[in-house]
Amino acid sequence: MQLSHIALGAVVVTGALMQGQGGGDPQFDRGRALFDKPFSLVEGLGAPEMNADSCRSCHQDPVIGGAGALELNVSLFGNDNGGNGPFTSLPGGPTVSKMFPPSIHGREEYPTGVNGADVFEQRQTPSVLGNGLIGQIPSTVITANEDVNDADQDGIFGIARRLTIAGNIEVGRFGWKAQIPRIADFVNDAMFNELGLTTPENGRGFSGITDADNVSDPEITQAEVDDITHFITMLSPPQRGGSTAPEVAAGEATFESIGCAKCHTPSLASPLGPVPLFSNLLLHNVMPPNFRGIAEPGAASGFYRTPPLWGIKDTAPYMHDGHAEDLRGAILAHFNEAEAVRIAYEQLSTTEQDALILFLEDL
């Protein structure tokens, strides 16, 4: 996969796109340099904690801005009273941390009683490729697909993540819990929680404005935040393989017929045209029975944003914590709202299952 640059306002979301390297966009180039830059302690890195020294350290597969391998997972923790609820956030618990590394299978193997915690959760590094197009999708398009009360009685709900930002309600669209509404918010949040770098206060609640080191705050200027935001915004989405094999076409038909497309919506409308992300950007619970995970306001334990499937073949392992090692494993890891879909997949012939995987690998 090659790094590409999109020209918003005249975007073609399939086919060849401009190359983003030296493509006549100085802000893109500055943003890329900052995304790629290893920061140092004298620049403010690492207070109160750091998971990496650069954005690219985690967002790297298969190109800069992509996903991260299992060993790059971060952890969160809290207390849910032994599974009886309610969920209680603990000091340090909402902060993504590499303090407790995952096992090679993505299982949470932590000592009990850390700060009173009895719930631990892994989070895998998501790709940011194509996030600029996702940011163009109107919130009303996302909320139009909600089915909070399962009106069609198919067992699949879908809830938009509503966030109160500076007194206003905004719809989240980025992050495993759809906890981030804008790319600039993602940049501010990651700078502080992943790198330990402070950014200017903007009233939206995602900036870390002060820390415990001796470096003057903010450690990242607003211009630098803007450059990184622009770089991410202009990264093109992964391009489909364009296979004309009949097996791929058959797999696409199966994807639709067994119900995968109910959540992994092939495209969502935007002012720039359809965005072929294969996600509805809604929260769903597809976790197994008795799953215990992190709860947030507006996103209960077990509820995660439907991840986009574009470029899915390059982002293994799968699910929020990377516990599915391949695409078949990811499908088989769907429960709860997706129970009927998983059962339908299990009842397919081997040939039909193989065709579905070929289709996914072509996205």
Model-based region annotation:
Residues 3-5, 14-363:
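Periplasmic c-type cytochrome electron-transfer domains
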